[in-house]
UniProtKB/Swiss-Prot annotation:
Family according to the record: Belongs to the uracil-DNA glycosylase (UDG) superfamily. UNG family.
Keywords: Cytoplasm, DNA damage, DNA repair, Hydrolase
Major enzyme class: hydrolase
Alphabetical list of Gene3D superfamilies matching this protein: Uracil-DNA glycosylase-like domain
Residues at the catalytic site: 60 (proton acceptor)
The species this protein was found in: Shewanella oneidensis (strain ATCC 700550 / JCM 31522 / CIP 106686 / LMG 19005 / NCIMB 14063 / MR-1)
Described purpose of this protein according to its UniProt entry: Excises uracil residues from the DNA which can arise as a result of misincorporation of dUMP residues by DNA polymerase or due to deamination of cytosine.
Primary site of residence: cytoplasm
Localization terms from the record: Cytoplasm
Recorded name of the encoding gene: ung
Protein name as annotated: Uracil-DNA glycosylase
Amino acid sequence: MTWPAFIDHQRTQPYYQQLIAFVNQERQVGKVIYPPKEDVFNAFKTTPLEQVRVVLIGQDPYHGPDQAHGLCFSVKRGVKAPPSLANMYKELVNDIPGFHIPNHGDLTQWAEQGILMLNTVLTVEQGQAHSHANAGWEIFTTEALKLLNAQERPIIFVLWGSHAIKKGAVITAPQHQILSGPHPSPLSAYRGFFGCGHFSKVNQLLMARGEAPIQWQI
């Protein structure tokens, strides 16, 4: 199985046809929908299924201009890092020796190293957080997680916040490893995201099985 084959199969399902009809209709009536159509599946394009080593679960795309480009927590170059990403950078400074805060928020290099940067919902209306919740994306992304759960090789799942932890309930196979904790948003970062050490823990787990660590510096 590959991501393109997975997506093609989902496209045959009634829920998906309703979902895409809804998203296309929203675009057609003139609503601004993020990310742009060509970026909706960026996470799957950038990190092929057979290369996934780590999964990072976000919620829905950023809903401001030029932010979302299909990778959770990531923003296009030239756009200020949103608060959650800024807090991730702060934790990286404390957790990874020598890490310095980048002057951008584009996490594509993480995705290219095998981190699937997966939002639970893949589209959103401009300025309306969670506006496409319950339209069908949750089914799509749960099916993607079930496929990841079925992979024989071990995968590390990083679940920040109650939303991601609930979403990760489908990860049941014993070969996988789960790191969970509070979300990096300003509302919860001080409840245990700061100091969680998840970035170095990911690398410890990868190196323990003979794999290259993630180069977090971007």
